[in-house]
Amino acid sequence: MKRWLSLLTLLLLLAFPACAEQETRIIDRITYPGAEPEFAFTPDAELLEIVFPQVLNADAMLLRSGGHAILVDCASAHQAGRVTTMLKELGVKKLDAIINSHPHYDHLQGFELVAKAVEVGELRVAFPADYNKHMLKAMEAADELDVPVEFYGDGDVYTLGNATLTAWCKGDDTWNCNERSAVLKVRFGSATALLTGDMLYRTQIKLLETIPAEELRADILKYPHHGLNKLNDDFYNAVSPKFTVITNNGTKPKEGKKYLSYKHTAFAFTVPGYVSLTTDGETWLIQRLTPGSLVDENAYADEMQEE
């Protein structure tokens, strides 16, 4: 009987593939400001929010769901104030965790300032504690601020409300830091996002070789390495993003901007204003929130540092 039920289930999935994986809807009010003006999530809807602060050539993103909040990366020391300002304006007083994709200054150096501004439950890292000076500094700050440090690796899953973040750490010790960036696949209902750190071409090839194509597919793509590099075509086709966020302004990331324009993929830069992506698991509402003050989109807060 069980075998018959399994066969029947398989036949139903083959006959109605749309039922197996619901297609999410995108309401993009950044590209199309007047899109579906009457739409709003129901007051009791459980939501996942992803919000990008006004950082450029650096990464930080807030994820909130089910009364919990985390940061993925925390920008540089010079731009951490932009992160803490956003947290204050959005009413975030506690972060369950800060998850670091890789220990470069523009992704990890802001940890100390953020952890002094809000309560941080833990710092999660995917590299050895002594990997470089930025890791050593973060470990020292975590110790001084009594923030526990947890190490994560390939296949580990982090739960945020009813959302999950699955880590893909496919690089090896011979790869450079950017190439070894942890990639996080976010799932919430049928909605998905891919957060890619600063991964480069080699990482994309490795993901294609080790992750099933259907697992790579994502509605939202955080474009890797601040839009400075072209994507591998096969990787892009596997992900097939409906919307992409570039953590930069409109002048520096020429390759990413050009590539997405060629692919006719909607995208947004993280300055000026906050890029907000909210979903109930079926629909993404994408809009730009107006902060208390706008940063100059052509002015970098960082002097280029040794990564």
Where on the chain are the PLM-derived regions?
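Short histidine/acidic/glycine/proline-rich micro-motifs that form metal-
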Residues: 126-131, 173, 250-251
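Secondary-structure boundary/capping motif
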Residues: 79, 106-107, 134, 176, ...
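Core dinuclear metal-dependent hydrolase active-site scaffold
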Residues: 21-94, 143, 151-216, 273-307
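Active-site metal-binding motif and surrounding structural segment of the metallo-beta-lactamase
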Residues: 66-70, 78-128, 210-228, 240-245
